[in-house]
Amino acid sequence: MSETSGNDSATSTTATPTSAPVAKKVPFERTHHGHTFIDDYEWMREKESPEVIAHLEAENAWTSAQTAHLEGLQNSIFTEIKTRIKETDMSVPNRRGNYWYFSRTKAGLDYGISVRIPISGPDDWTPPEVGEEPLPGEEVVFDSNIAAEGQEFFSLGSFSLSDDGSRLLYGVDTTGDERYTLHVRDLITGDDLADTIDGTFAGASLDPSGRYVFYTTVDDAWRPEKVWRHVVGTDSSDDVCIFHEPDERFFVGSGFSRSGRMMFVVTGSKTTTGYWSISADDLEAEPQEIWPRVDGVEYNVEHAVIGGEDRFFITHNRNRADFDLVDVPVADPTAPGRDVIVTESGAGTDGELRIDDLRIEDVDAFADFIVLSYRRGGFARVGIIRLGDSSSPFAPLQELPFGRETGSLYVGNNPEFEQASIRLHFTSMSTPAVIYSHRVADGTDTVLKRQPVLGSVDLNAYAETLLWAKAADGTDIPVSVVFRKDLHRFDGGTASATAGTGDGADEMNGGAASAKVEPAPLLLYGYGSYEASMDPYFSVSRLSLLDRGVVFAIAHVRGGGEMGRHWYDQGKTTAKKNTFTDFIDVARHLIDTGWTSPDRLVASGGSAGGLLMGAIANMAPELFAGISAEVPFVDALTSILMPELPLTVIEWEEWGDPLHDPEVYEYMRSYSPYENVTEAAYPQILAVTSLNDTRVLYVEPAKWVARLREVGANALLKTEMVAGHGGASGRYDAWKEIAFEYAWILDVLGRSDIEIEA
């Protein structure tokens, strides 16, 4: 335990630091509900302070010194990633209006290049085959590499085209703070128009005609609160605010339906949704509320035409926590809706699916069918409902099959209302992403692209399985696992593994638990917040861990959405500790069943998953050799007590309101990582953050590491000085960030000296 001598300066950097930075202490009192917390490191919140910058730079210098022996390994991992990824590649073209749009990446360039070619005719729905050479008639729509020249950071937050392809709206962020400047480009001349709109939120859109821009601005707490209408060719000072949301619990956004016939304004808190519509025939009309906004009711809206009548498809939780799907007339949306999927009696389903088994997540409407995205049995699924006429509007829901139960099927990019096929993406822990085209009329599937994995990779070398760990309260927690078959083997026959063939076709059904001959080095990932599902997915960069004998696992803990709405409800507000204990119980299960051991187990999580990392570090430090926390939300109570901070008020429905509720205050105080650091034998800890992160401020991990170091923990802090919540923006720098973190993890696991062939 160490302290400064009381001088007012933070530790200064040296060329080669020989000791960790020791942050000065400036006691700051935080008093709420009769409790006072003394925060010695709150002074680090002053982002513009030279002293704070000096401290962060000193931390970076110390981290560099402590990981200098891993530079060779970092370079090797970076080279492996670079070798295995097809640097010069192209996406599958999507039709929009009279063009096929797609993107290209080129070796040596950080960002993608958006291009297009004209369709051959109105019946041209077959995407052209794209190679490395430009196609006849190919033209560049937007080259992010040119736009990013001279910038240390570059991100697009809006990218919207007019239906005729003559105009492009794009929004640029060059600092990482997620505040975008909008521009309109004339795609006929290639020149930007005079229109420039600063300080917007992501997700601005151009109306189908290309005449109007709709965008959102934020308040002082970075909450999107207003929707504006801009007429292209006019000064932004003349823009009209068409919607203002004063309630600080709600974000506001806008966008157009796939049909192009409706513009929506959407307000959303963590528990409540509101929708307003404007007909594209009169975009200067007032927004009309679709359903009255009711606390606790969430819904999403899509527009379609059935039997010549405009209808809204609405997914909602008015009557069922896992959502229902109805359709209502646009002319009278509060009229009683028609059930699109009916219950387990069999009518309206294919005879096998029961609506009670589905967590409905989204609906996409097309001219002749709708596509339903939902969760069943813990995994992402997709179903089709064909549309008829007004007398028989809905065919039975047909779930689309795929080859592996442990994989995930998603709806891809499908911009055209009239298209007869839909794009689908399939992936699993051992299956690189496959893009399919599914023709609804006859059910045929066509593979359009397989994620390329270059180098000497043998996809058959990897296996995946699904385990179930028992939580302390008896709940079964799913755990997705992937590993190299030739480096690990099972005994006892109590579980089997799925061999990765790269096409998602061959399956050996995964079992319950498995025992390994000897404990393996294992990286356990978790998130568990916002009902976000951490579905199994393939990662090229992860191969650098697997090939060095590391097993990778995802703990699908409560607070996420994997098993339905109840899974989320049991891991939020005053049930939040279930997220932490679930992760700990998964770790114990993996140890007890022989998969790993405490000296070979590293935990990883980011953002709200970083809160999970901080909590388990305090609650069960003995289970882990290391913890990697990316942009970690580790000073949760302080942040949620400050309504002036970005995202705080809207977050009260996720974590509770400790500012006004003493019970919530005490509950959060009992787990918030920063103020629960204690004298303990902590595992090695790496915290990575970004100075310009608006979502989780850099100050949280900075304070946390200072406090950890105060009690003797081996903790490192790495701050990206020009980046936001997502880290570096260029793909090569992003790969270097991954290589840095993987090298640290391998070092903790004792695998840093293993050389592999890329």
What are these model-derived regions, one by one?
Residues G171, R185, T216, H230, ...:
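Generic beta-strand/beta-sheet core signal
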Residues V141-F159, G171-D177, D191-L193, H438-T444, ...:
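Cap/lid segment of the alpha/beta-hydrolase catalytic domain
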Residues G493, G511, I554-A758:
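Active-site-proximal cap/loop segments of hydrolase catalytic domains
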Residues L135, F159-S162, G176-R179, D207, ...:
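Conserved structured core elements
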Residues D281-L283, A321, P329-P333, E344-S345, ...:
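Active/binding-pocket-proximal capping segment
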Residues F251, G260, T272-Y275, G296-E298, ...:
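Active-site lining segments that contact anionic ligands and/or coordinate catalytic metals
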Residues L156, T196-A202, V218, W222, ...:
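Alpha-helix capping and helix-loop boundary segments enriched in small/acidic/polar residues
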Residues M1-S421, H425-A433, S437-D442, G493-T498, ...:
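Beta-propeller folds
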